[in-house]
């Protein structure tokens, strides 16, 4: 059987297209958290420089919400890691449901999540964070966890001009620890009184 030049060209295009699709799939898996399907820290490191540049040029405003599931270690210790994984997947789904197409929810690791928002007003960020908090508190169908046991705390910040990713995350984390210190299951957005992470009970 012989293949003409036209047939060979079509075959070559198909092989190249398949190879490119496989490469794209491999890269996509590398930047996705395997448990929740959200983007991971690697994706943040690769993608955020572009957003930071747009923010510097005042084309967009950039905000960050840091979330942490309250007393999550107790969930794993009491009901096991399989149940804990269900909680993580459900929380990730809540983030995805509440996020807009321009927002970027990511899992940093463990029970820690962040969401980057194209937003210039703190009130808009607070509305998003409070919606996530309320939806999380309403989870009542992950047996055998009782209703109301699953909650999240959050810290929200707007990016300062010239601020890098690490600095932005640290500010959001300080507010997150403040939320934990003030009773958990709450959103903090003011830098006034910052909690020392070392003094806050785990979770």
Residue ranges of predicted features:
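Short regulatory alpha-helical coupling segments
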Residues: 27-28, 41-61, 92-100, 118
């Amino acid at each position: 059987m012989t293949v003409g030049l036209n047939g060979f060209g079509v075959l070559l295009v198909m092989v190249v297209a398949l190879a490119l699709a496989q490469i794209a799939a491999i890269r996509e898996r590398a930047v996705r958290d395997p448990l929740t399907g959200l983007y991971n820290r690697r994706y943040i490191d690769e993608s955020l420089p572009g957003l930071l540049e747009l923010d510097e040029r005042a084309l967009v405003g950039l905000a960050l919400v840091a979330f942490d599931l309250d007393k999550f270690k107790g969930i794993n210790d009491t009901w096991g890691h399989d149940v804990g994984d269900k909680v993580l997947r459900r929380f990730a789904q809540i983030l995805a449901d509440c996020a807009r197409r321009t927002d970027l929810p990511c899992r940093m690791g463990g029970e820690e999540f962040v969401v980057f928002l194209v937003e210039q007003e703190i009130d808009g960020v607070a509305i998003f964070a409070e919606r996530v908090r309320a939806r999380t508190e309403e989870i009542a169908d992950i047996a055998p966890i009782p209703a109301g046991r699953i909650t999240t705390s959050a810290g929200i910040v707007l990016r300062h001009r010239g601020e890098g990713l690490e600095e932005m995350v640290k500010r959001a984390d300080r507010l997150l620890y403040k939320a934990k210190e003030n009773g958990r299951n709450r959103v903090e957005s003011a830098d006034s009184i910052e909690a020392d992470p070392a003094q806050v009970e785990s979770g």
